[in-house]
Amino acid sequence: MITFLSGGTGTPKLLSGMPHNADTVVIGNTGDDIEMGDLLVCPDLDTVMYLSSGILDRKKWWGIKGDTFGTHDYLVELAKERGWDGNPNFLKKNEQISGKRIANWRRFSGGEEFMKIGDRDRLFHKLRSRLIEEGKTLTEVTENLCSVLKTDVKLLPMSDDPVSSILQTDLGEMHFQAFWAGWKGKPEVENIEFRGSETAKTTRFVVDALKNEVIIGPSNPVTSIGPILSLKGIEELLSETKVVAVSPFIGDKSFSGPIKKLMMAKGYEANTSGLMEMYPFVDVFVIDSNDKTRIDRPMVRTDIRIDCKSDAMRVYEACLKAFEKMEKK
């Protein structure tokens, strides 16, 4: 059995190369989760859930293929009629810590929908929110939704407690989704905080899953994997098992997302060397054949670009070779 740490689109693209019905557990990042109005949106969980059930829109790598956006478009139209400027409306501090705890520091106005949500996708967010209100944990709700969709992996949220990726920027404090989906990654980033991680707890399911061999896919190491690592005890658990990480870099170039800006804000070089510094518990890295970064850690080289299923299969096979290189822990 293999456990993946997943967030964003990097690890899901790698997962697309897994053999069908492989014995796989995925621990999903929830630092990107937000609440807009009455919708609890869990983007990184949803991407894996939709991928493993065969309904993911693989052109965008988010949302449901063939979805429509009538409700979203009309909400935006109404908001603009009321004078909305199109920017995210992150609620004030006193509103962030009132209501159900899972939405703490994740609350945005529901009347100003800066994130594009499809009509079918919206129904899953609505169902998730209703089940949470009925007293179920996020782990229980995720299991319920995966059962409905007949997913072929076991998907676990990193925690049932709220952890929010909060960025300090030149425009002020903002949630990661405001920075990325709202402001398109344009603000300058000064620091990143995983708010709530100091009190959030891992579940026993996550602890058990981290006893398996672990693969960290080529996801953003700061905001896709960082929230998972910020939880108490996670890095210690990873240091006790076999871990392979796939670099999201070819030299100083990353495949997608605001990795460079975010790694520099955390004080790391935005390249494979910086990644290795961020992941001291990793045993073997899978890096690109053309990556000229000087490396003093065990590695396997391959073409790490993932544009199709055969690419994903190639990178996954490189991960298996990486496990073969390790001594027993």
Label each PLM-derived region with a short phrase:
Residues 29-193:
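Electropositive, gly/pro-rich neighborhoods at or near active sites that engage anionic ligands
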Residues 255-329:
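C-terminal functional extensions of proteins
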Residues 226-266:
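Redox- and metal-dependent alpha/beta enzyme cores, enriched for Fe-S-associated oxidoreductases
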Residues 139, 190-208:
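Active-site glycine-rich loop that binds ribose-phosphate moieties when present
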Residues 196-198, 220-231:
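Active-site glycine- and acidic-residue-rich loops that bind
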Residues 1-3:
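Extreme N-terminal starter segment of soluble prokaryotic enzymes
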Residues 25-29, 242-249, 284-289:
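Short internal beta-strands
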Residues 18-21, 235-241, 279-280:
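Short, conserved loop/helix-junction motifs that constitute active-site signature segments
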